[in-house]
């Protein structure tokens, strides 16, 4: 019985055993399960649905009156309480508690809920509970959650410095892929989301073979976070399902202040969905060409009458083929989270996620772009060099728990523990050789990988305001402890003997059906990676004047990595690397020109150890990458925060950039420089009109001022917009966008790909207040292009359509 048949027969058993087991154990430990979300607490909890608000900045009293009328609540307070106080306004879709928190931010007042939809206002003994600038817990700060706002931007983010800042206050380039944007474009995984993100280049070295890489400002992205907690690249973040996340925050430039080491490219922060105070649920379904089908549900709300326990459960299932022959994928997500209000000041959160993906015949490293005679191949996009016995199976599991405490006087603290593991088993096949015009010349080169890397993190910090020289400032300090362990079997490496055998030959690629003898792999040894990182950081935002702010921070890191390779019957090879007392400074400054525009500048150090596999001719690890990063820019906030704009210029200087030479050998490039410009606009242009547009120019050069990394575009432009029609057509939303990039190529003189643009469209119809139907048409003009180009290339996704529905209740 082949691997495919075993997987199909075992799928149901796996779901009933492993997935159900994870759900039962995970939710049991939380004291909740999906059915509990249907408890009568929904009916008994005093709840108000979310509403749209558009309250301008100004005096507080009329703003509160406007809010009370829009939210249909009774808000009582002494008149003297609001005298002389003002608000920054409120724009977007929020529930009552969220709206009041944002409206009252910085006023020193707080609202408390009474009976029969009544609220009272009083002076806050601990203003930090409501002040936007003083809260930075779990992405829960008022204005940070994007679900339900309908916007293509957010009101606040803490991904850059962990201080809760508005996009305008953040002294680095920031893009937030909001829940509305993810839904409108049907961006279902991280690769989809980043392909739509300005300033990010996605290089696909295959399809379904864990070979996607993400690049920003000329360098590969290596910093990933989930809810602000760093996670290893070996946990295959690229395959994360967007169904469990509220948004994706991308900070371009080095963020070593809070995220691992100081990688110069970008940091990707995935923010999980949280339980909602009000009951809500939705069911989705989708169908598209290439036999792509999916369904999911998302249920959230209070689990008790008082609402002091809240839960959320998300499930998503997809089965899909693709435009290449024999490819087939099944994936399943289960995510649960519960919040417990242990007191008015203490919040306990526990949760889990489980993602399984089984892929048949994944394409690895693409197909030749030139024949042996030198002409371009122009192969059919449906060709696949993967045999029917190849596969790529993953099971990703994560458990997390945290406790958050309001400490008084605007201070709060958080401790979070996470455990994540990624069980994988991969049997890939590479097409090797020179392709002849008659389809002959290629051989198969199979390889197998398997293992279960694990990572444990402890993250703790405290944040709050302090007074100095008569002004109030903000501070955050914390520690991160990370332990990564990977012990994997060795399967004998690349099967060159198989490539040279009759069973390994591909007689004619043009009509090959993927049939060949499956190679036998015998475990031949063990390898391991043990990596520990301990870091402490301190950051403060000083309010120098009403218009001038200064952010100063530093991070102190101890890092150690031990790797070993133990072949059975051979000599063990060990490589040990350690860095202690690494100091990473950070500085940022912002100056408000007026109520709309701000100038900013930032500086940070770059320090990043090389990957465990990056060694020189002597099998010695390369020295860590080191350098500095500079960024200058101007940012604007428009329409009461519904629209954000930015212009940035940057320069990165780096030594010891790893350049591949041959096999597993790298050299260290010195004096590399990356510089460029980024422009971006995100948010609401007018009522019902959302837009995102971004242009990026980036070029990386060596010590001789020669361009390197030419497989990355020098120029790129990405845009997407959606518009809800008015009048009798107000149930219809239409949208579309274009992704364009300039010429690229591994060698621009012998092989290159010219500039190209991919156009995408969408439409949604609200059948009634509960049910909506959508259609997405991608690559409308069926543009043929390589998503990775060189001697081997991988075609980008051809024209495709996806229809979907969503029922909310």
Curated annotation (Swiss-Prot):
Domain TBDR beta-barrel stretches: 278-809
Transmembrane helix keyword on record: no
This protein's UniProt keywords: Cell outer membrane, Ion transport, Iron, Iron transport, Membrane, Receptor, Signal, TonB box, Transmembrane, Transmembrane beta strand, Transport
Keyword presence, Chaperone: no
Any Pfam family: TonB_dep_Rec_b-barrel
Signal peptide: 1-45
Superkingdom assignment: Bacteria
Record's note on what induces expression: By iron limitation in addition to the presence of one of the two cognate pseudobactins BN7 or BN8.
Motif TonB C-terminal box per record, residues: 792-809
TBDR plug domain sequence ranges: 166-273
Subcellular location: Cell outer membrane
Function field: Specific receptor for the siderophores ferric pyoverdines (pseudobactins) BN8 and BN7, iron chelating molecules that allow the organism to extract iron from the environment, especially under iron-restricted conditions.
Record-given protein name: Ferric-pyoverdine BN7/BN8 receptor
Species per Swiss-Prot/TrEMBL record: Pseudomonas putida (Arthrobacter siderocapsulatus)
Gene of this entry: pupB
């Amino acid at each position: 019985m082949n691997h495919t048949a075993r997987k199909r027969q075992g799928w149901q058993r796996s779901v009933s055993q492993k997935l159900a087991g994870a759900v039962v154990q995970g939710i049991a430990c939380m004291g909740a399960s999906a059915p509990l979300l249907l408890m009568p607490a929904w009916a008994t909890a005093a709840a108000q649905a979310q509403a749209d608000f558009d309250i301008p900045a100004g005096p507080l009293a009329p703003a509160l009156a406007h809010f009370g009328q829009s939210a249909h609540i009774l808000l009582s307070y002494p008149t003297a309480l609001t005298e002389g106080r003002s608000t920054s306004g409120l724009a977007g879709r929020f529930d009552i508690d969220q709206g009041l928190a944002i409206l009252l931010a910085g006023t020193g007042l707080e609202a408390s809920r009474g009976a029969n939809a009544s609220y009272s206002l009083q002076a806050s003994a601990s203003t930090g509970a409501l002040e936007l600038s003083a809260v930075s817990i779990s992405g829960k700060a008022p204005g940070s959650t994007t679900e339900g706002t309908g916007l293509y931007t957010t009101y606040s983010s803490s991904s850059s410095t962990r201080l809760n800042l508005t996009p305008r206050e953040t002294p680095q380039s920031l893009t937030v892929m909001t829940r509305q944007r993810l839904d409108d474009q049907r961006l279902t995984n991280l690769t989809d989301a980043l392909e739509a993100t300005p300033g990010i280049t996605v290089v696909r070295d295959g399809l379904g073979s864990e070979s996607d890489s993400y690049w920003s400002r000329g360098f590969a992205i290596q910093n990933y976070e989930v809810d602000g907690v760093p996670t290893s690249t070996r946990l295959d973040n690229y395959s994360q399902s967007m169904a469990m996340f509220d948004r994706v925050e991308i900070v371009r430039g080095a963020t070593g202040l809070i995220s691992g080491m100081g990688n110069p490219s970008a940091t990707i922060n995935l923010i999980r969905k949280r339980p909602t105070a009000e009951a809500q649920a939705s069911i989705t379904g989708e169908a598209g060409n290439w036999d792509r089908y999916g369904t999911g549900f998302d249920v959230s709300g209070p689990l008790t009458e008082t609402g002091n326990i809240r839960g959320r459960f998300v499930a998503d299932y997809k089965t899909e083929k693709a435009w290449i022959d024999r490819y087939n994928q099944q994936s399943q997500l289960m995510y649960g989270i519960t919040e417990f209000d242990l007191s008015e000041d203490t919040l306990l959160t526990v949760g889990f996620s489980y993602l399984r993906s089984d892929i048949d015949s994944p394409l690895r490293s693409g197909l030749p772009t030139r024949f042996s005679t030198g002409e371009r191949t122009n192969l059919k996009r449906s060709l696949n060099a993967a045999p029917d016995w190849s596969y790529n199976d993953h099971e990703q599991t994560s458990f997390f728990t945290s406790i958050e405490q309001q400490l008084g006087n605007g201070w709060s603290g958080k401790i979070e523990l996470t455990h994540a593991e990624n069980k994988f088993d991969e049997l890939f096949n590479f097409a090797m050789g020179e392709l002849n015009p008659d389809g002959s010349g290629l051989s198969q080169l199979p390889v197998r990988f398997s293992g279960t890397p694990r990572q444990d993190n402890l993250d703790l910090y405290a944040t709050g305001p302090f007074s100095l020289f008569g002004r109030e400032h903000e501070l955050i300090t914390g520690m991160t402890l990370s332990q990564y362990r990977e012990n994997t079997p060795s399967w004998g490496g690349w099967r060159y003997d198989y490539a040279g055998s009759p069973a390994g030959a591909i007689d004619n690629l043009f009509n090959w059906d993927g049939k060949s003898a499956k190679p036998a792999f015998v475990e031949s040894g063990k390898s391991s990676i043990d990596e520990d990182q301990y870091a402490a950081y301190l950051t403060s935002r000083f309010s120098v004047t009403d218009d001038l702010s200064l952010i100063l921070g530093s991070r102190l890191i101890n890092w150690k990595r031990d790797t070993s390779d133990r072949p059975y019957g051979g000599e063990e090879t060990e490589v040990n690397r350690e860095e202690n007392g690494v100091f990473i400074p950070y500085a940022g400054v912002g100056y408000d020109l007026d109520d709309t525009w701000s100038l900013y500048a930032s500086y940070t150090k770059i320090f990043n150890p090389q990957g465990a596999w990056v060694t020189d001719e002597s099998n010695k690890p390369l020295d860590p990458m080191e350098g500095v990063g500079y960024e200058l820019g101007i940012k604007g906030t428009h329409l009461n925060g519904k629209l954000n704009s930015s212009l940035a210029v940057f320069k990165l200087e780096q030594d010891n950039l790893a350049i591949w030479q041959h096999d597993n050998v790298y050299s260290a490039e010195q004096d590399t420089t990356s510089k460029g410009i980024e422009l971006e606009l995100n948010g609401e242009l007018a009522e019902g009109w959302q837009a995102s547009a971004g242009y990026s120019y980036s070029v990386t050069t060596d010590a001789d001022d020669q361009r390197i990394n030419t497989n990355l575009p020098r120029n790129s432009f990405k845009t997407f917009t959606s518009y809800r029609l008015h009048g009798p057509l107000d149930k219809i939303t239409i949208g579309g966008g274009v992704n364009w990039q300039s010429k690229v190529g591994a060698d621009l003189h012998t092989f290159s790909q010219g500039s190209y643009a991919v156009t995408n469209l969408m439409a949604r119809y609200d059948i009634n207040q509960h049910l909506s139907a959508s259609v997405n048409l991608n690559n409308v003009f069926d543009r043929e292009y390589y998503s990775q180009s060189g001697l081997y290339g991988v075609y980008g996704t051809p024209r495709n359509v996806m229809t979907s529905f969503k029922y909310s209740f």
